[in-house]
Regions:
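Sequence/structural signature of beta-propeller domains
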Residues: 1-126
């Protein structure tokens, strides 16, 4: 998966998925998610795959209001809010520990790293 931060007709962002070919078949690149609504997803850039198969995406929009989120995207392509920043900063560097129990994410300012523990199998999409 990779993000096109300001891609799509509405310029709110897209996520593409690369499916490597097997047995000599060609690789396949497809559009996995495209936002048409800034309230649902806006300027996602850093992303990682959660232990559940969902994506965790860090938003990086530049506005005068505090409005960056960590967005989850289900395997079916539904976006949801996981967290919202309460300070004017962006989330970055999202990744999970090797055992999948701890999610690490950075805040650009004030500079800090958060370590968030699961249980990740109980994340609800609402």
């Amino acid at each position: 998966y990779f993000a096109c931060t300001d891609g799509g007709a509405a310029k709110y962002g897209q996520i593409y998925r690369l499916r490597p070919g097997t047995g000599g078949a060609a690789d396949q690149l497809d559009l996995f998610y495209e936002s048409t609504d800034a309230a649902a997803y806006n300027y996602g850039d850093n992303l990682c795959v959660m232990p559940t198969g969902h994506l965790m995406v860090c938003e990086d929009q530049y506005t005068d209001i505090v409005d960056n989120h960590l967005r989850g995207i289900t395997p079916a392509g539904k976006a949801y809010v996981f967290a919202k920043s309460r300070v004017q900063t962006e989330f970055a560097g999202a990744c999970f520990s090797p055992d999948g129990s701890t999610f690490f994410v950075n805040l650009m300012w004030p500079t800090m790293t958060l370590a968030i523990t699961g249980p990740w199998g109980r994340v609800r999409v609402g």
